Every structure is written in structure tokens, then in C-alpha cells.
């Protein structure tokens, strides 16, 4: 366990490193950044490549001045918790996972009650075989970016639940959530905010669930094919998903 209560920084890559070389990783490591603590580096402020069971709990700041505040390439079962007041950010792609080697990139869990953001790219970027991930943006949690890229991108067989804010601050015509793999489930809870499209591209087997309360109106611009479910029994139409408050029977033309 590494606990940071002060500042650990430098104009370097891999400030906290769980990966040395292939076959030489630190599994089941825990990194705790306390309130006021800072990990700051150039790229890969926390390098979790090829690790298993990495746990990061942040109440302070994890920052990459270039790319990847947290790098999860080829990692398994990582747990990232960004608590209220916590900040995770990078100039490009704040939290990243992909599969590029012989190990799977799978089972990551990201829970956010603080702020995660990227300036030039995506705040959360899962792609190229990153599977079975769970993303939970809690009430009060903010995930945003200021570029034309999607704010959050997920890959395959993953779950995203938004009770907070996901915000593409460049333009609402960009993707707030992008999906590049199949068989994912996205749930948008009451009082959650999504600025940007939900873009499923040519993927299949994806489900959008809405839980805004009986009789509540909402509208989300979507691209691609989705199964739509309103968990409160309201009627929801396909295309761009929406429901206009009309009691228990709701439609949007």
C-alpha cells in the first residue's frame, strides 16, 4: 500500500509504477491519495499496465500534464474510486484501458463522486478489447472534456450508470458517451445530466435504461441501434430516445 498525503511529482513518466517489464508487475497493489495529496507526472501518473487487482482511492489530485493520469493497459480487475473532492485529469485521456498484449484488459471498476476530466481527448477511454468494465458516476460526480472526442468511451460487455454529470463542453453535438463494442448497458438515473450524444456506431446488443421517475420528460440524442427501457414504466420511443411527461403513458413524436 502506498499512501500519498503530500506531493509526489516530476516532469517524468510513470510516477507510481506497478509495471516494470512484461512478467514483472506488482499485483494487488493499493494506492491511496488523501485529501490534499498530489500525484503529478508527465504521462502515466499511475502506471497499472498488466497488473491484476490494482486499487486506487483518490481524495486528492492525480494529474498527467500530457497523457493518461491512470494507465490500465492489459490490466485485470482494477478498482478506481475517485471520492468527493477528488480530481483526476490529463491533457489527453485521463483514465485509459486497452488490450494490446497477451493479457486481457478486463474487469475494471471506476466509481466517481469527484471530478474526472481531459482537455484534448477523452476523460475515460476504454477501447481495443477492454471488456467487462463497470462505470458508476455518482450524484455530484462530474466527468467532462473540452474536445470533439467523446467524454466517456466504453468497449464491450460493460455497464455504465450515471447519477451525476457527463458533459462534453466542446459541443452537445459531440458524443457524451460513445460505445465501440457490443452488449453494453447504460442506465441514466433521475437528476443525472448528460451533455452530448449517445453514439453506438455500428455496435449491437446495447441497452439504454432510463430511470427519471413516472411522468418525467427527457430527451437524449442517440446514434446507432439500442434496446430502450424505461424503468418507471413510461413509454419511450426509438431513434433519439425521449419521453414527454404525460403521467404513465408517454410518447415523443
Q: Would you name each region that the model predicts?
A:
Residues 1-253:
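Long, low-complexity, polar and repeat-rich extracellular regions
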Amino acid at each position: 500500500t502506498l499512501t500519498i498525503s503530500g506531493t509526489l511529482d516530476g516532469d517524468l513518466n510513470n510516477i507510481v509504477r506497478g509495471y516494470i517489464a512484461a512478467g514483472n508487475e506488482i499485483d494487488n497493489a493499493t494506492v491511496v491519495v488523501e485529501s490534499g495529496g498530489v500525484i503529478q507526472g508527465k504521462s502515466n501518473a499511475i502506471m497499472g499496465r498488466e497488473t491484476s487487482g490494482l486499487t486506487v482511492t483518490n481524495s486528492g489530485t492525480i494529474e498527467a500534464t500530457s497523457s493518461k493520469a491512470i494507465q490500465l493497459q492489459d490490466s485485470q480487475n482494477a478498482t478506481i474510486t475517485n471520492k468527493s473532492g477528488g480530481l483526476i485529469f490529463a491533457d489527453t485521456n485521463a483514465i485509459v484501458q486497452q488490450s494490446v498484449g497477451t493479457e486481457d484488459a478486463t474487469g475494471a471498476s471506476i466509481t466517481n463522486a469527484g471530478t474526472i476530466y481531459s482537455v484534448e481527448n477523452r476523460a475515460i477511454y476504454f477501447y481495443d478489447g477492454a471488456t467487462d468494465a463497470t462505470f458508476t458516476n455518482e450524484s455530484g460526480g462530474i466527468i467532462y472534456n473540452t474536445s470533439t472526442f467523446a467524454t466517456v468511451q466504453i468497449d464491450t460487455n460493460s455497464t455504465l450508470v450515471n447519477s451525476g454529470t457527463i458533459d462534453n463542453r466542446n459541443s452537445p453535438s459531440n458524443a457524451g458517451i460513445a460505445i465501440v463494442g457490443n452488449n453494453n448497458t447504460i442506465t441514466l438515473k433521475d437528476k443525472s445530466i448528460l451533455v452530448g450524444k449517445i453514439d453506438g456506431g455500428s455496435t449491437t446488443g446495447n441497452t439504454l435504461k432510463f430511470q427519471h421517475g413516472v411522468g418525467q420528460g427527457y430527451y437524449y440524442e442517440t446514434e446507432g441501434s439500442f434496446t430502450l427501457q424505461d424503468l418507471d414504466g413510461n413509454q419511450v420511443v426509438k431513434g433519439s430516445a425521449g419521453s414527454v411527461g404525460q403521467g404513465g403513458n408517454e410518447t415523443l413524436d
